[in-house]
Amino acid sequence: MTSSQDACYISLLGLAEYFRTSSPPNIKKCIQCLQALFTFKPPLKVEARTHLQLGQILMAYTKNTELARNHLEQAWMLSENINNFDDVKFDTASLLAQLYQQQEQSSLAKPVLRKAIELSQHNVYWHCKLLFQLAQTHATDKEYALASELLAVGVESTDESNATYLKSLFLLSRAMIMMIERKSSDVLAILNQAGTIIDNAIQNIHLKEYLKVFFFVLQVCHYLQLGQVKTVKTSLKQLQQSIQTIMAPNWPSDEQIFGQNSTEMFMWLPKEQLYVLVYLVTVSHSMMAGYMDKAQKYTEKALTQIEKLKSQENKPILAVFQIILLEHIIMCRLVMGNKSLAIKEIALAKDVCLSSSHKFLLKKHSPQLHCLLGLYSMSASLFDHAERQFYTCIQETTERDLKLFANLNLAIVYLRMKREPDLRAILDQVQQENSLCSNSQALMGSFYYVQGLNAFHKSSFHEAKRFLRETLKMANAEDLNRLTSCSLVLLSHVFLSIGNSKESMNMVTPAMQLASKIPDIHVQLWGSAILKDLHRMLKEPALEQEAYNNHLNFSQNLIADQLKCTKFQEHTLINWIQGDPPMPMLTTQEPMMGEPSQAAAMRVAAGAPGQQVIFQ
């Protein structure tokens, strides 16, 4: 460039920045200034940098992704083979790959990132950043083996550069991928390796605490994935202590902690998001342990925190947290007999999914929404709708646990509909698919429970006792309170059916105590019906009347809630089977067409064996 060209270049850059930072920003003039630079036929480095700047501006301030893509592709083509041009070259590759991802063209993103990784081996920061990005791209496409391989390359590269903090991040990220792949033994081995490094080799106390939160989140999720609710308690307590340390007022800001040197600028999640995540795993634990009140309390706190963060900056991950929390709280509502809140929250979850960019969340969570609608329909005794929803969930999902969960509830639906061949087919399929897999203790205990329930309905009482004792053994080992209460009340009904009133009373008493603690209205409804019959057999009229009054109270609450549900517009969601769900709807008080609501409600209140749904 000549000196006059140089002066024009600097002036145009200054003007572009002035327009960008004006209040409000004048992006059109900013872009015009940058485009004017090309009239001076600048050197390759200047041309490449300008194309990158235009791509950045267009992505940040406009919806013109095609023009942004064009500029970034130009910047990548120009900078790819220029030496000593790392920031522009690799920033371009990273941003271009990100744009391809947004356009759902990951097949274009991967070769760009692979080439950039190959060119960045001399630069630890960019090499690791690009490895993480490519691993994330493969993970998003469910290519977990490739993602794991890239993270293993990251571990090796940090060994060469002695970047211990980065090595811990690569190890923990790889453990997370292994969890998705259900490689339990590999997860434990990698977590143990990472834990040793965090404890002994990380000197910076602030970085150490962040890594501990990441480590304990994974450890807690690993135990919960295996249904080990009791085993996880120590790790969960340590996680809660670590997050309290990070959230303390005297703790430095993320900017201070992660800005010291290039190999320590990587952060898994900012502390405000970690705070929500810890609430989320605590909710998951409370739900599995059968503490619905606790789960509700922590969910409300987490959702409040999410709304606060959204008002500051609406990051996409906040919607992910919100949808998972809603999925948990909906199951809590159904257990507690509050279907009217559950269907409202299912509709809210649906709206959150629809509002996400490119309906990304809907693609990920459509099976879960169908499963929740199946549970809602099932709890309302709308078995035809429940069947269709569970079947859709099973067809759509690729997650083994969700498929097993939906199949077990579908089995109960077939049991209630007296469809023995379909029930048998599901039980055989579950047995076959899960005989060689390490499954969640909670889900496998539920499988034995469903078999016990089936045996009870066939009056095979000895077989029912055998299955239910197996369920109780698994449930008691890990404090799975809801599974315990369901098994006890069914076992009590088994003993009542064979005339053993003493054993029946011994089972139903702790079942009712647990059910009131959870609280689980369906077990309480069932248990109060058993108690009424037991006290009549034992000629205890006062206690029989008390049990009858309790049963009537539970029944009336369920009937009232059921009648309320059928008047909600959201109730029509049970008819959504394929495609996108209906857009956000206004609540109406008009009653639904279809089955008379009173008849449906009465079926719910009947308290028949197996009415309660299974939840993880």
Curated annotation (Swiss-Prot):
Main location: nucleus
Lineage of producing organism: Eukaryota, Metazoa, Ecdysozoa, Arthropoda, Hexapoda
Assembly description: Component of the cohesin loading complex.
Domain of life: Eukaryota
Organism from which the protein derives: Culex quinquefasciatus (Southern house mosquito)
Protein name, entry field: MAU2 chromatid cohesion factor homolog
TPR repeat placement: 90-123, 445-478, 485-518
Ranges annotated as spanning the membrane: none
PANTHER family: MAU2 CHROMATID COHESION FACTOR HOMOLOG
Record flagged with keyword Lipid metabolism: no
Record InterPro entries: MAU2 (IPR019440), TPR-like_helical_dom_sf (IPR011990)
Pfam families to which the protein is assigned, alphabetical: Cohesin_load
Keywords from the named record: Cell cycle, Cell division, Chromosome partition, Mitosis, Nucleus, Repeat, TPR repeat
Known function: Required for association of the cohesin complex with chromatin during interphase. Plays a role in sister chromatid cohesion and normal progression through prometaphase.
One of the GO biological process terms: chromosome segregation
Subcellular location: Nucleus, Nucleoplasm
One GO term describing the cellular component: nucleus
Gene3D superfamilies cross-referenced by the UniProt entry: Tetratricopeptide repeat domain (1.25.40.10)
Similarity section: Belongs to the SCC4/mau-2 family.
